[in-house]
Amino acid sequence: MRAVLEAADIAVVALYFILVMCIGFFAMWKSNRSTVSGYFLAGRSMTWVAIGASLFVSNIGSEHFIGLAGSGAASGFAVGAWEFNALLLLQLLGWVFIPIYIRSGVYTMPEYLSKRFGGHRIQVYFAALSLLLYIFTKLSVDLYSGALFIQESLGWNLYVSVILLIGMTALLTVTGGLVAVIYTDTLQALLMIIGALTLMVISMVKIGGFEEVKRRYMLASPDVASILLKYNLSNTNACMVHPKANALKMLRDPTDEDVPWPGFILGQTPASVWYWCADQVIVQRVLAAKNIAHAKGSTLMAGFLKLLPMFIIVVPGMISRIVFADEIACINPEHCMQVCGSRAGCSNIAYPRLVMTLVPVGLRGLMMAVMIAALMSDLDSIFNSASTIFTLDVYKLIRKSASSRELMIVGRIFVAFMVVISIAWVPIIVEMQGGQMYLYIQEVADYLTPPVAALFLLAIFWKRCNEQGAFYGGMAGFVLGAVRLILAFTYRAPECDQPDNRPGFIKDIHYMYVATALFWITGLITVIVSLLTPPPTKDQIRTTTFWSKKTLVTKESCSQKDEPYKMQEKSILQCSENSEVISHTIPNGKSEDSIKGLQPEDVNLLVTCREEGNPVASMGHSEAETPVDAYSNGQAALMGEREREKETENRSRYWKFIDWFCGFKSKSLSKRSLRDLMDEEAVCLQMLEETPQVKVILNIGLFAVCSLGIFMFVYFSL
C-alpha cells in the first residue's frame, strides 16, 4: 500500500505555511506598495543572495520536480541539457540584457520593445504572446504538477487538488508585493535544496552510488508477465518498456527524438533566450537589485545553483524508475491508466512516488510543503506579471482614460479568466508528449518563442533594426509557429501501442528543428525589411542597444512631447511649492539648484500636482503617468483628485482596512512623490556603476560558471 502523509507530516506542512504567511504579512506591513520601486521592484534594494535564490525558485518550482524527474525516468540524462543551458543564458541576462533594461528605464518587456522600436504594434504582439505562454505553458503546468503532488500524497482527485491550490494561492497573493515574494523565495530555496539533497543522498545510498545508478537504470524494465497477472490485462502490443540505448548521453544524434544536438544548439538555445532574458517573471526580479553588481552577482549565484537540478531532480527520477519500474515504465495505456490516471505514461509520478516512499515521516511533510509553496509562489508571480502586462500594455492602450480602480478590477478579472482557461487545459497536458510534462512545456514554447528571441537579439545587437522589420518578421514567425502548434494539437501522437499515421512533416520533424527554422526565418525577414525601410531614430536607439548602453545622454534627448515618463524641472519646483510636507532640500542633500543641473534624461517618472489652478497639471497627457503609478504589478495606486482623497479619509475603518490590505490605498502623490522619486533617481543613477575590484571578482565568477556549464555539457554528452 502506498504511503500517505501522516499526522507529523501534516503538522510540518501547516507550520511551514504559517511561517510563509507571516513573512508575507510582515512584508505587506513594512513595504511601500504604492510606488514603482516599492511594489514592482522591491524598492531596488534587494541583494544578490536574495535575488539569486528567488531566480532559482521561480524557475525550479514543483513543475520541474515533476517534469525533470519524469523525463529523467523516461529518457535518462537528456533533460539535464536545459539546466546547463540556463546556466549560460543567465549570464547573458546579467551581462548584456539587464544593463540595457536599467539604462532604458523600463519596467515591462513589452515596454522595452515599444521604447526601442516606437509605436505599439510590437508591444501589443509581445504582450499577447506572453499571456498565451503564461496560460498554456506556465499556469496550466503549475496547476497540474502541484495537483499531482497532492494527489500522490493525499489520494485526492486531480481537479479537487487544482481547486485547493488556487484557493491557497489566493491567500498568499495579497501578501505584499515583490519584497514578500523574494523573501519567501529565499526561504523556499534554502529548504528546497536541503530537502532535495537529502532525498538524493537517501536514494543514492539505497541504490549504491552514482555509477550503480547508471548501471541499474539501463536494466530497469518492468516485469510484463507479473503486471498482466496483477492488473488482469490482456497481452496486447506493449509499449517501449526498456530504457533507451543512449539514455546516459545528454546531447544526442541529430535524429534522436528527445535532444538532437543540432536542434538543441541552433533552435532550443535561441528559444530559451525568451525565458531567461525577456520574460517578465525572471527579469522583474533582477531589476530589483540595488545595483548592477548585485544584479550580476544574482545571475552568477543562480547559475551555480542550476548545476544542482541534474543531480537532485533528474538522477532521483532515474532512481525512481529503478525502484518502481513496474509502475513508472507502464507497459500499455490500460496499465498506465490504472497506475496514474493517464494513458500517455506515468513518468510524471516518479519524484512524488520517491518522496512518499523513501523520505522519513516529518521530512516527507517538509518536502511536500516546499514543493507546493514553491508552486504557489510561481502562481503568485505569474498572476501579478500577467495582469500587469494585460492591463498596462493592452487594456490601457484600448481605454486610455481608465481610472486606477478600473484598471485594478480589470486585472483581477483577467487573472480569474486565466485560471479558468488553465484548468480547462490540464487534460491536454496530461496526454501530450507521452506523459513527459517537461517536454510538453518545451514543445509549446519552441513553436512560439523563437521569433521573440530573434527580435530581442536584433533589437539589442543591431542598431539598424527598425519597427517595420521587427513587426513583419515577428508576425511571420508567429504565424508559422502558430500553424505548426495547431497541427501538433490536431494530429495528436497516438498511444504507444498504436501505429503512427500522422503526416510526415509532423512526426518526422523534431520541434527543435522547427524552432531553428522559426528563429532564422524571423531574423532574415526582419533584416531584409529593415534594410528596405527607413532606419530607427536616434532617440529610439540612444539607450536601448548594446552598443549605446554606456553612452552619455544629451539634453535634447528628452524634448519629445510624447515622452510618457518625463518629469520637467518646472514640475519639481511647483510641486514642492504646493506640498505641505516637502521642503526645498531634497533628502539626499540636493537643493533646488542641484536639481536644475539634472538632465531631463536622468529622470524617469512624472511628478503630478493635481490641484486646481496648477499650470503643471494642464500638461495633462493621460498617458503621462508611469505604468506602475497607474497599475503596479497587479496593484492599483490611487492617484485621484483631492476630493476623492478627502472622501476616502471619511470612510469607515473597515473599508480603510480593506483598501490597505488589498493595496488599493496610497498616500497622496503630491505629499510623497518628490522625496520618493528623488531617492529612486539617485539610486538609478548609481546602479550601473561598478568598482574595478568588484568588476574583476564578477568576471572571475563569470569565467568559472561558464566553464563549469561547458564542462557539464561535454562530460554528459561524450
Curated annotation (Swiss-Prot):
Protein name per Swiss-Prot or TrEMBL:
Sodium/myo-inositol cotransporter
**Pfam family of this protein, just one?**
SSF
Alphabetized Gene3D superfamilies for the sequence: Sodium/glucose cotransporter (1.20.1730.10)
- Report where it is expressed, by tissue: Highly expressed in kidney, placenta, and brain and at a lesser extent in thymus, lung, bladder, and testes. Expressed in the choroid plexus epithelium (at protein level).
Name its GO BP terms in alphabetical order: inositol metabolic process; myo-inositol transport; peripheral nervous system development; positive regulation of protein localization to membrane; positive regulation of reactive oxygen species biosynthetic process; regulation of respiratory gaseous exchange
Instruction: Point out the annotated site residues (description: Implicated in sodium coupling).
Output: 24, 285
Phosphoserine (modified residue): where? 594, 632
Which catalytic reaction applies to this protein? Answer: myo-inositol(out) + 2 Na(+)(out) = myo-inositol(in) + 2 Na(+)(in); scyllo-inositol(out) + 2 Na(+)(out) = scyllo-inositol(in) + 2 Na(+)(in)
Stretches in topological domain Cytoplasmic: 30-38, 111-123, 184-186, 325-353, 431-443, 533-695
- Which purpose does this protein serve, as stated in its record? Electrogenic Na(+)-coupled sugar symporter that actively transports myo-inositol and its stereoisomer scyllo-inositol across the plasma membrane, with a Na(+) to sugar coupling ratio of 2:1. Maintains myo-inositol concentration gradient that defines cell volume and fluid balance during osmotic stress, in particular in the fetoplacental unit and central nervous system. Forms coregulatory complexes with voltage-gated K(+) ion channels, allosterically altering ion selectivity, voltage dependence and gating kinetics of the channel.
Where's it mainly located? Answer: membrane
What happens biologically when this protein's gene is inactivated, per the record?
Mutant embryos show brain myo-inositol deficiency and central apnea and die soon after birth due to hypoventilation.
Cellular component terms, GO, for this chain's entry? apical plasma membrane; basolateral plasma membrane; voltage-gated potassium channel complex
Q: Kindly list the residue ranges recorded as spanning the membrane.
A: 10-29, 39-57, 87-110, 124-144, 158-183, 187-205, 304-324, 354-376, 407-430, 444-462, 511-532, 696-716
A molecular function (GO) held by this record is:
D-glucose:sodium symporter activity
Q: Where in the cell is it found?
A: Apical cell membrane; Basolateral cell membrane
Keyword Cell membrane in annotation: yes
Say which family it is in: Belongs to the sodium:solute symporter (SSF) (TC 2.A.21) family.
- Organism whose genome encodes this protein: Mus musculus
Which InterPro entries does this entry report, sorted A to Z? Na/Glc_symporter_sf, Na/solute_symporter, Na/solute_symporter_CS, SMIT
Keywords on record: Cell membrane, Glycoprotein, Ion transport, Membrane, Phosphoprotein, Sodium, Sodium transport, Symport, Transmembrane, Transmembrane helix, Transport
Q: How does it assemble?
A: Interacts with KCNQ2 (via the pore module). Interacts with KCNQ1; this interaction is direct. Forms coregulatory complexes with ion channels KCNQ2-KCNQ3 and KCNQ1-KCNE2.
- Positions bearing carbohydrate: 232
Q: Which stretches face the Extracellular side?
A: 1-9, 58-86, 145-157, 206-303, 377-406, 463-510, 717-718
Gene that encodes it: Slc5a3
